[in-house]
């Protein structure tokens, strides 16, 4: 483990990467993203397999509440077939929430555990990696295009980006620039909002952990209540960020699907 404060922080902000530069693959992000997905699938498949028509267990009740809540949000905001959008929204919320929740694990626990197996760098929160949030947002971007074409056709898509908001051929270049910027802003804002909040949360946990390294006992003792308070507040943050990512995805797809009505 790193010695000085600067080395400690730098160590915790370094990825387990394969390759260099733009083409570097963050293996820790991939691993924990897949792990979060496996946890989600395991819990929900187990509940589905053990579902009963009688008195349900606590886990089944919780899962049914979450499913009903997400389905209600989709029903209120997406005015079209929900057979794909509702499961997509549920997957996004649960997957992002689980990835966010990894941030609640003490900052030194997983890196030290990995160090025992010869892995010297490890960042366990996938959503604190811009490559992960951009990857999810790019998927949403292509879904926006898909639902726009599905509702209006390819010709309608071209018309939307050339004759809106100014319905005259003279303004085609202006319309195209305005609509393209608006379209690209959606996935970019999705990615950076989630990344920014989770990166900041991870960094605050690291800075609080630095207090335990101080020579002053009072400063070390102060780190305990600060850690507890921030962890409790962070539960709200990780839930809210998962909700926002899911909700904006629903809204963006709803706008794309219902453009024909505008």
Swiss-Prot record:
The keyword Transmembrane helix applies. GO terms for biological process: proton motive force-driven plasma membrane ATP synthesis. GO terms for cellular component: plasma membrane; proton-transporting ATP synthase complex. It is a multi-pass membrane protein. Keywords: ATP synthesis, Cell inner membrane, Cell membrane, CF(0), Hydrogen ion transport, Ion transport, Membrane, Transmembrane, Transmembrane helix, Transport. Pfam families: ATP-synt_A. The chain crosses the membrane at residues 24-44, 84-104, 129-149, 165-185, 194-214, 228-248. It comes from the Bacteria. GO terms for molecular function: proton-transporting ATP synthase activity, rotational mechanism. It is found in: Cell inner membrane. NCBIfam families: ATP_synt_6_or_A, PRK05815.1-1. Key component of the proton channel; it plays a direct role in the translocation of protons across the membrane. HAMAP family: ATP_synth_a_bact. Belongs to the ATPase A chain family. This is ATP synthase subunit a.
